[in-house]
Regions:
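Class I S-adenosyl-L-methionine
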Residues: 2-24, 94-107, 117-308, 377-383, 387-408, 412-512, 622-705, 724, ...
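Core alpha/beta nucleotide-donor-binding catalytic domains of modification enzymes
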Residues: 4-147, 158-162, 166-172, 549, ...
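Conserved SAM-binding motif I beta-strand of class I
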Residues: 53-56, 517-522
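Short, conserved SAM-binding/catalytic segment
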Residues: 66-75, 531-543
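Signature of N6-adenine DNA methyltransferases within the class I
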Residues: 176, 180, 190-192, 198-212, ...
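Non-catalytic DNA-recognition/assembly elements of restriction-modification systems
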Residues: 422-423, 432-434, 446, 492, ...
């Protein structure tokens, strides 16, 4: 829970903000942590976002933010240490003020750029002080988890993700793992190391960007708000319009920040003769090589980095800006023509900082009106702080692009299912020709919306349930696939492609693989035709090659082994077409099921190295899939995602996704849950343990504690399928017990609910009357049990349990244990926190055992 101190609303609340807060789109808000001078998040201000709070340790940098009116209220500028609760409480107080004053229910964006000391996992024991420093990263993670903004952004050095931190659990782990384990249950997260020069920044800057989108924000993925690729710009294009500065100490008359920073005059000879791309160390005249004189002896400077004293190229991308951009002995700081380091203005332009950004509370016009001596005094006082903050900053254009895209996706109206149905009805899109025409001519909707319309139109035409896979769900699944660096050529199969929901995220993930071949298969020729029309709406890179195949993937002879198989196979049992069922079963090891998805699992395991499928959650526990699970558990199950009922809107089915590597032996499995909103990692053998009848993906130490106190596999279960309400009546010879009648070691009488029947002739359930049986309500997480009384029977809402070994003695203590909170929590884990697959069958009855020591 967020703690906050008492807050006080400002006496005068700005009317414009109040009006905006009452608009249909509301305010757009953000918090910035470790914000330095606010150069990066100035881009959010430019896009109309309001800064709720900004936190910076150094007051001189925080002041620069105030010069730019970043926060509406002074209390939003927080100078403090993020490791202290006092600083955090100030942030929470600001959030509370905006919540109460402006009806901001959710913070839109949390930005964090914490100091990070790059360090490999292998070397973490050698540099524990660096791990402590990286605790600031963990503080950022904790703030995201507490505040739960709609989006979060982390920006940092190239080695950020592989650097080590001490996580909230006290263990040292990579920063990427810490982010994933703490935030992966709540957010879809994109991790990317990119050079900002490819994304609109005028200079080279290789950095790590981590963007998270809260999972309850449907149809939006981190890819949707990632900066867009743009052509590189040369240094000449960026700063070539500025006047040349030839005289040391010279300050441009019209721009105080375009200045020739002074240095020791003897150093000018070191760079005056070098050409673009050359270093002072390339001078042939030894007197022009960087040196010092100690006790009359010339000592030449060491050339530790090849980019010291190096003149830059006019017609190449500008170099990376570092904190020591004030000296020639730093990296790539020498102007292409002038004998000086880049001016502040040039560095600003190279970091995409707009002219409107203020470094002082003195207006820019007044600064330019100062006398030369006054200008020099101003720069002497402020220049180093300005240059250092620029060297540490996020380029403004990068955050501005993200802000722009976040604002757009938040303001865009959502295409609801009702809207979709209306479009289909008005345009008569159940007709294939009409649908194709609509897709090809409509420019108002993007791929995701058009595919949703197409999926629902197909479903209405075929009279089937629509299993449209949302783009956020696709991102979750695709993000678990192998990384780009593993491949130079990549072959992907989507065996039941439908309208191709996975294609955009697959293309985005593997855009940097040199060659990507994607085979898409569907049994329905119309689906393939519709997909081809939809693909025209996607920008397909030249490295992506899509082949369309109309076929039944279960019977098709695939000619190659695929690197990745991904998809959402049909979920249905074949009951009428016995010939087709026989063909499917002929190829399958599991002969106990008629469900198509189980056949898909086996077939895809035979043609793919890595297999990722969305399937019904019943896979992990139903008896009919025992053989399928046995086949799968022999290979490495890298990931399991439990979507619960959140996988498909409007379809009441629980689903999971698994990623299975057919080439590898079992190892660790990462489990992500939409139910518990967390991520955890455990040995595969732990969750697929043969001592239990099925997989237990939520198994933990608490579960094991209860399991160790019990004897299992005591009962077999039976449920009646015949006795219906029509067969029963309010009174009669034999009582029919129903789920609400079952109490803790007792029968509960309920007026106008109790039922009876006079005759059991021909009913299979009759064999249990007046036998030693236990009764358990079916479909409940509040288990309770009692012995079945004489002259009673139970309908299908109650499971009838009998002992496998007649000699086993069942006591009231055993049954009473089922009604305890301890067993209820245990049973929830035993049923994998399911909501629909709760029938007590001969697998799940396993967990109703006897106590090893009879004491409640």
């Amino acid at each position: 829970m967020i703690k906050s101190k008492a807050y006080k609303l400002p006496e005068e609340i700005e009317e414009a903000i109040v009006a905006e807060s009452r608009s249909s789109y509301g305010l757009h808000t953000y918090v910035s942590l470790f914000s330095s001078a606010g150069v990066g998040c100035y881009g959010f201000k430019e896009e109309g976002f309001y800064c709720v709070a900004t936190v910076e340790l150094l007051e001189k940098r925080l002041k620069i933010q105030s010069y730019n009116n970043k926060c509406v209220y002074k209390s939003g500028y927080i100078c403090g240490d993020m490791t202290t609760q006092a600083t955090k409480d100030k942030v929470f107080a600001e959030l509370e003020m905006w919540k109460k004053g402006f009806h901001v229910t959710d913070l839109d964006v949390l930005i964090a750029t914490p100091p990070c000391q790059g360090m490999s996992v292998a070397n973490h024991k050698k540099k524990k002080d660096e791990i402590i420093r990286n605790s600031l990263v963990v503080e950022s993670i904790k703030m995201v988890h507490q505040i739960k903004p709609k989006f979060f952004i982390f920006e940092n050095v190239r080695a950020f993700l592989t650097s080590v931190c001490t996580d909230v659990d006290g263990n040292a782990k990579s920063i990427k793992e810490a982010i994933e384990m703490n935030l992966g249950g709540l957010y879809n997260i994109l991790y990317k190391v990119v050079n900002f020069k490819d994304y609109g920044n005028p200079s080279s800057r290789t950095r790590t960007l981590v963007i998270g989108v809260r999972k309850d924000i449907k149809e939006i993925t981190p890819c949707d708000v990632f900066p867009g690729k743009q052509p590189e710009r040369t240094l000449r294009q960026v700063i070539g319009h500025l006047p040349s500065l030839k005289k040391m100490g010279e300050i441009s008359e019209n721009d105080i920040y375009h200045n020739f920073r002074k240095y020791n005059p003897k150093m000018e000879a070191w760079i005056s003769e070098i050409k673009e791309g050359q270093s002072a160390f390339d001078n042939t005249d030894i007197n022009r090589i960087p040196h010092t004189v100690k006790n009359g002896v010339v000592v030449y400077n060491a050339q530790k980095n090849g980019d010291k004293y190096t003149r830059q190229y006019w017609d190449k991308v500008a170099p990376c800006i570092h904190t020591r951009n004030d000296i020639m002995a730093s990296q790539n700081t020498v102007h292409p023509v002038d004998n000086r380091v880049f001016s502040i203005r040039e560095v600003m332009l190279m970091m995409s900082v707009p002219e409107s950004f203020n470094w002082s509370d003195i207006p820019f016009e007044k600064l330019n009106a100062l006398t030369p001596k006054e200008k020099e005094a101003f720069l002497k006082k402020e220049e180093m702080n300005i240059r250092q903050t620029l060297g540490e900053a996020v380029p403004t254009i990068i955050f501005r692009q993200i802000a722009n895209k976040i604002r757009r996706v938040l303001c865009k109206p959502t295409l609801t299912e009702q809207d979709t149905k209306g479009i289909i009805e008005r345009r008569k899109l159940t007709d294939i020709d009409n649908l194709l025409r609509f897709i090809r001519t409509n420019n108002s909707y993007k791929f995701a919306e058009l595919s949703k319309i197409a999926e629902l139109a197909n479903a209405q035409r075929e009279n089937n349930a629509a299993y449209y896979t949302r783009q956020d769900t696709c991102f979750t699944i695709v993000s678990k696939l192998p990384e780009v660096k593993e491949y130079t050529t990549l072959d992907i199969l989507e065996p039941s492609v439908g309208v191709g929901n996975f294609l955009p995220t697959l293309i985005q993930k593997y855009a940097d693989v040199p060659v990507v071949n994607i085979d898409v298969v569907d049994i329905d020729e119309n689906s393939i035709t519709i997909l081809q029309a939809l693909v025209e709406k996607i920008n397909i890179p030249q490295n992506i090659h899509i082949r369309y195949i109309v076929a039944d993937s279960l019977l098709y002879n695939f000619e190659k082994k695929y690197d990745i198989v991904i998809g959402n196979p049909p979920y249905m049992k074949i009951t009428k077409d016995k010939k087709l069922l026989a063909l499917y079963k002929e190829q399958a090891q599991n002969k106990d099921t008629n469900n198509i998805f189980a056949f898909f699992i086996e077939k895809m395991m035979s043609v793919g190295n890595v297999v990722s499928l969305i399937v019904p959650k019943s896979l992990i526990n139903a008896p009919e899939f025992n053989q399928t699970r046995a086949i799968m558990k022999e290979k490495r199950i890298a990931n399991i995602i439990d979507f619960g009922e959140k996988g498909f809107k409007g379809v009441k089915i629980e689903t999971i996704n698994f990623v299975l590597d057919t080439r590898k032996a079992p190892d660790m499995t990462t489990i992500e849950s939409y139910i518990t909103e967390d991520v955890r990692c455990c040995p595969q053998e732990y969750i697929t343990d043969d001592k239990f009848p099925y997989w237990l993906i939520y198994r933990d130490s608490s579960f094991d504690k209860v399991a160790n106190e019990m004897n299992f596999n005591v009962f077999k279960a039976y449920r009646d399928r015949v006795i219906t309400k029509a067969r029963t009546k309010a009174s009669g010879r034999i009582r029919v017990l129903k789920s609400r009648n079952i109490g803790n070691n007792k029968i509960v009488n309920i007026a106008d609910y109790d039922s009876y029947i006079d005759d059991l002739d021909g009913l299979d359930v009759a064999k249990y009357m007046n036998q030693d049986c236990i009764l358990l309500p079916n479909l409940t997480y509040n288990p309770r049990a009692c012995f079945m009384p004489s002259n009673c029977i139970a309908d299908g809402s109650v499971a009838i349990l009998t002992t496998i070994d007649p000699s086993v003695n069942i006591t009231e203590d055993d049954l009473a244990f089922y009604a305890t909170d301890e067993f209820s929590k245990f049973y929830s884990v035993a049923r994998n926190r399911g909501t629909r697959s709760l029938n007590i069958d001969n697998n799940s009855v396993f967990f109703f055992g006897t106590l090893k020591q009879h004491s409640i």
